[in-house]
């Protein structure tokens, strides 16, 4: 077996590397070339990069494409650029805006991975005769411990917990996992940068890319307003107990759990606890109203060994992350008449619809990724849940 788990010599194995122009994917290309693989580098031009050309931490923009080209020249592999701007807008940017005006907190990186990178680019890699598509993500894959067929693989958390990207990859399908390779899964980021220096790559000291590459300076509301001019409609700021406290200029300016910049002063600390898109109301309340014990999921991608329905009916004990920066915490995957849900044993504050809930076998660096889903509804403590239900059933002011 070679280092990518193929039963052939590296020189007989063609690999396409998804190159963003950053240090991680550049090192992947360099490592594979050094090991003797037949390597092709492909960079996707994903969005109108005019505003991002000179912005540190951008991704798949003008300078990034040039950096990827220079890296490929340095290590001696072919480099191709594919224009996916229209596809990226259709499958990532537009749904991102739609989700925000619906009162959700979307994660466009998941959509990008599943549509543009792991679907379209993967198909292109196969057309080029590649045996695998390699990326610079910090996650591990290896042969499945209980394979149902030859070549089945499973996902695991990486060695560098601070760089763990498994949360953004929960929706990777089994077919995609079998074809993908993640050479950096066993390396710390510091070693990746050291390798870039050793290889003489121009990106060795380049800043890491931002989570949301197409949002300049992190101002989500700017891009949503541009794409959806009617999104910034005014409405009420309402307390969980029914009091109208003020007005806002669009729910897209708020997120669940927000405390600063709400726009009301009451003498008590208030947090955004719910965004009522239908009635254009921002619902605020005390911190304890953010406490969440249960989240209902949609679009579940299941990577466990037993059937999803059987696992949920029996109450599948696992660990869950509802934020990329948190460690997995004890959870139970179950189901009821409403659908699949995850019971968060220790609770979590400020969980918003649209966020992901990724599932794991444990909390360590070698924990297996069981998949996950998008949160469609969160359930609070009984008192807060009852108050919110009563408020939503009451008509909003005209």
UniProtKB/Swiss-Prot annotation:
One Pfam family cited in the UniProt record for this chain: tRNA_Me_trans_C
Catalytic residue list: 112, 213
InterPro entries: MnmA-like (IPR004506), MnmA-like_C (IPR046885), MnmA-like_central (IPR046884), MnmA-like_central_sf (IPR023382), Rossmann-like_a/b/a_fold (IPR014729)
Gene3D superfamilies tied to this protein: Adenine nucleotide alpha hydrolases-like domains, HUPs, Translation factors
Binding site for ATP: 18-25, 44, 136
Site (Interaction with tRNA): 137, 355
Catalytic activity: S-sulfanyl-L-cysteinyl-[protein] + uridine(34) in tRNA + AH2 + ATP = 2-thiouridine(34) in tRNA + L-cysteinyl-[protein] + A + AMP + diphosphate + H(+)
Disulfide bonds: 112-213
Function according to Swiss-Prot or TrEMBL: Catalyzes the 2-thiolation of uridine at the wobble position (U34) of tRNA, leading to the formation of s(2)U34.
Protein family membership: Belongs to the MnmA/TRMU family.
Name of the protein described by the UniProt record: tRNA-specific 2-thiouridylase MnmA
Protein species of origin: Sinorhizobium medicae (strain WSM419)
Organism classification: Bacteria, Pseudomonadati, Pseudomonadota, Alphaproteobacteria, Hyphomicrobiales
């Amino acid at each position: 077996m070679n280092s990518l788990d193929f039963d052939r010599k590296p020189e007989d194995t063609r690999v396409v590397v998804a190159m963003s122009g950053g240090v991680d994917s550049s090192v992947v290309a360099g490592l594979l070339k050094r090991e003797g693989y037949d390597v092709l580098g492909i960079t996707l031009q994903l969005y109108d990069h005019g505003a991002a050309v000179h912005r540190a931490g951008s991704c798949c923009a003008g300078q990034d494409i040039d950096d990827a080209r220079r890296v490929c020249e340095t290590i001696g592999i072919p480099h191709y650029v594919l224009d996916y701007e229209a596809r990226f807008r259709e499958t990532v940017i537009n749904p991102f805006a739609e989700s925000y005006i619906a009162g959700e907190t979307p994660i466009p990186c998941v959509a990008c991975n599943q549509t543009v990178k792991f679907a379209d680019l993967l198909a292109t890699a196969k057309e080029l005769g590649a045996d695998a598509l390699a990326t610079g993500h910090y996650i591990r894959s290896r042969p499945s411990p209980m394979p149902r067929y030859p070549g089945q693989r499973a996902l695991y958390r990486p060695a560098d917990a601070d760089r763990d990207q498994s949360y953004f990859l929960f929706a990777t399908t089994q077919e995609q996992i079998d074809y993908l390779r993640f050479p950096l899964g066993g390396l710390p980021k510091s070693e990746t940068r050291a390798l870039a220096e050793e290889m003489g790559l121009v990106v060795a000291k380049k800043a890491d890319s931002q989570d949301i590459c197409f949002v300049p300076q992190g101002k989500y509301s700017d891009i949503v307003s541009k794409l959806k001019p009617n999104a910034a409609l005014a409405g009420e700021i309402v307390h969980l107990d029914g009091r109208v406290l003020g007005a806002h200029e669009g729910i897209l300016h708020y997120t669940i759990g927000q405390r600063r910049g709400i726009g009301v002063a009451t003498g008590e600390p208030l947090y955004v606890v719910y965004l009522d898109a239908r009635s254009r109301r921002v619902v605020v309340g005390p911190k304890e109203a953010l406490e969440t014990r249960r989240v209902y999921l949609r679009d579940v991608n299941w990577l466990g060994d037993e059937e999803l329905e059987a696992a949920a009916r029996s109450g599948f004990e696992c660990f869950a992350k509802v934020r990329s920066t948190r460690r997995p915490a004890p959870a139970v995957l179950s189901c009821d008449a409403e659908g699949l849900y995850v019971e968060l044993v220790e609770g979590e504050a400020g969980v918003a619809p649209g966020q992901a809930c990724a599932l794991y076998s444990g909390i360590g660096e070698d924990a297996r990724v069981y998949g996950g889903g998008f949160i469609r509804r969160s359930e609070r403590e009984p008192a807060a849940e009852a108050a919110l239900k009563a408020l939503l059933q009451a008509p909003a002011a005209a």
